[in-house]
Swiss-Prot record:
It is found in: Cytoplasm. Its cofactor is [4Fe-4S] cluster. [4Fe-4S] cluster 4 binds at C70, C91, C94, C97. It comes from the Archaea. It comes from Pyrococcus furiosus (strain ATCC 43587 / DSM 3638 / JCM 8422 / Vc1). [4Fe-4S] cluster 1 binds at C18, C21, C24, C131. Keywords: 4Fe-4S, Cytoplasm, Electron transport, Iron, Iron-sulfur, Metal-binding, Transport. One of its GO terms (molecular function) is oxidoreductase activity. Heterodimer composed of a small WOR5-S subunit, with four [4Fe-4S] clusters, and a large WOR5-L subunit, containing the active site tungsto-bispyranopterin cofactor as well as another [4Fe-4S] cluster. [4Fe-4S] cluster 3 binds at C58, C61, C66, C101. [4Fe-4S] cluster 2 binds at C28, C118, C121, C127. Binds 4 [4Fe-4S] clusters per subunit. This is Aliphatic sulfonate oxidoreductase, polyferredoxin-like subunit. Residues 9-40, 48-80, 82-111 form the 4Fe-4S ferredoxin-type domain.
Length: 173
């Protein structure tokens, strides 16, 4: 009998609960890089309109377009969490994963030498923890089958911001 596989998780983002404090960015960069380096954070908060903060991270698409686009197989899927994992030694920073991603989530921070994508911190995302501790709860771990709707969440930050601004302000920009 094979080892039991953990149910796959993803991070549900509720932008209207985001204060824009960016503790998630700080915590993520400390967890992954050992320093405060928001540019290398696997989650980013965008404020394209005043007062509308949009946390943005990988939704772990079930068809993994970024993984499939990588010419060097630097991206793989963690068997336990279903998260995309980057092999920094194989990454040639070509940007194929960025182009393939519907949300344009992967980034190549200056000085990093490889792409960064959310790996769900091995199943215990630190950004979700700090957001909860700060009392915002804009980020939440969810499980289950979201295949029918995942493209709803896999949008670029500008598109998400425009959607929210239309709802808040009731007009097009």
């Amino acid at each position: 009998m094979s080892e039991e596989v953990q149910e796959r998780i993803w991070i549900l983002i509720t932008p209207d609960k985001c204060s824009g404090c960016r503790l998630c960015e700080v915590t993520c960069s400390l967890e992954h890089e050992g320093i405060i380096w928001p540019e290398a954070s696997r989650i980013r908060v965008f404020e394209l309109f005043p007062g509308i903060n949009v946390p943005h991270t990988c939704v772990q698409c079930p068809d993994y377009p970024c993984v499939n686009a990588c010419p060097t197989n630097a991206l793989s899927v963690d068997e336990k969490t279903g998260a995309v994992v980057v092999n920094e030694e194989k990454c040639i920073t070509c940007g194929a994963c960025v182009l393939a991603c519907p949300g344009k989530v992967p980034r190549i921070p200056a000085g990093k030498g490889s792409v960064v994508i959310c790996d769900l911190c091995g199943g215990n995302p630190k950004c979700v923890e700090i957001c909860h501790e700060a009392g915002h709860d804009a980020l939440k771990i969810v499980t289950g089958n979201y295949r029918p709707i995942y493209r709803t969440f896999a949008k670029d930050p500008q598109e998400k911001s425009l959607d929210i601004a239309r709802k808040v302000f009731g007009e097009d920009f």
